[in-house]
Amino acid sequence: MKPSIVAKLEALHERHEEVQALLGDAGIIADQDRFRALSREYAQLSDVSRCFTDWQQVQDDIETAQMMLDDPEMREMAQEELREAKEKSEQLEQQLQVLLLPKDPDDERNAFLEVRAGTGGDEAALFAGDLFRMYSRYAEARRWRVEIMSMSEGEHGGYKEIIAKISGDGVYGRLKFESGGHRVQRVPATESQGRIHTSACTVAVMPELPEAELPDINPADLRIDTFRSSGAGGQHVNTTDSAIRITHLPTGIVVECQDERSQHKNKAKALSVLGARIHAAETAKRQQAEASTRRNLLGSGDRSDRNRTYNFPQGRVTDHRINLTLYRLDETMEGKLDMLIEPIVQEHQADLLAALSEQE
């Protein structure tokens, strides 16, 4: 391992011990805000510190085994111990490099999921419904909570657009690479000739930001329209203008919310989605500016022109960003997404590691 990385790890290990001592200080315990901040830092440093301690122990084992090689009676055993220690050292180095990667502060946050039907008319709306069901099943398996914020149903089923908030541990970090184009190839139910049609949907995943981090929005930049809800809600539906449409005039971003019976609640929800969209647009703009001065666009989720193709006749799903093809479409549509998400997370980590090596 490079000396510069070892020095960085030593500093983090020392900070971990320092924070541990501070957490036992009566003055710190009395200051709840400081105590919470240090507790978070301690938790973040614990894995790195533990892994680095293991790595240091293995370096001692390697040194001991190398000394034993000079003893003819111990040589065979020393060679075996040396091989095992070097193997373990390599594994720990890989773990440490991943632990040192810059963390996206949004990864642990809840997320807004938007699925929109694109080209393909009714079939695209049906596929948008299939995608939303797929993500809902995945969320259910991970014990996340799905709350529909707004939806516009297709004429023959599915959705022209659906927006949901997904709450739970690490939602955004897990779903952020889903943003982009999703294409389906299948025979629509309305197709009498049995011809395969291609339709498309777009998916957007944005972190839910705490109020303090939401972008400043000038009320004068907003046009707020009210209209009658067309969704579920029993007798109350279509009797009051409870649904809200907010247009952010400088960017042209439009958000609708009609899920709640209360206009006030719909407005609050719509504003939170609007803030997330503006933040996402600003982040994308900043990353594009950074990319123009760097060789690769890293850590942006900008793998999005055409994420996946779902080919129903062949039972195939292909992720074009990493050239991954799996013949497990049925499982995918039932929400078993880890087999697709994990490889792209690993690819992203590999990109970051390459950038880290270049910096070193």
Swiss-Prot record:
Extract the Gene3D superfamilies matched here: 3.30.160.20, 3.30.70.1660, 6.10.140.1950
Q: Which GO terms describe its cellular component?
A: cytoplasm
Q: What does the UniProt keyword field contain?
A: Cytoplasm, Methylation, Protein biosynthesis
What about PTM? Methylated by PrmC. Methylation increases the termination efficiency of RF1.
Domain of life where this protein originates: Bacteria
Q: Which GO terms describe its molecular function?
A: translation release factor activity, codon specific
Q: Which Pfam families match?
A: PCRF, RF-1
Q: Where in the cell is it found?
A: Cytoplasm
Q: Give the N5-methylglutamine positions (modified residues).
A: Q235
Keyword Cytoplasm carried by entry: yes
The record's InterPro entries line, in alphabetical order, gives: PCRF, Pep_chain_release_fac_I, Pep_chain_release_fac_I_sf, Prokaryotic/Mito_RF, RF-1
Q: Where is this region: Disordered?
A: 284-313
> Would you identify the family this protein belongs to, as annotated?
Belongs to the prokaryotic/mitochondrial release factor family.
Q: What does this protein do?
A: Peptide chain release factor 1 directs the termination of translation in response to the peptide chain termination codons UAG and UAA.
> What protein am I looking at?
Peptide chain release factor 1
Q: What is the scientific name of the source organism?
A: Salmonella typhimurium (strain LT2 / SGSC1412 / ATCC 700720)
Q: What high-level taxonomic lineage is stated for the organism?
A: Bacteria, Pseudomonadati, Pseudomonadota, Gammaproteobacteria, Enterobacterales
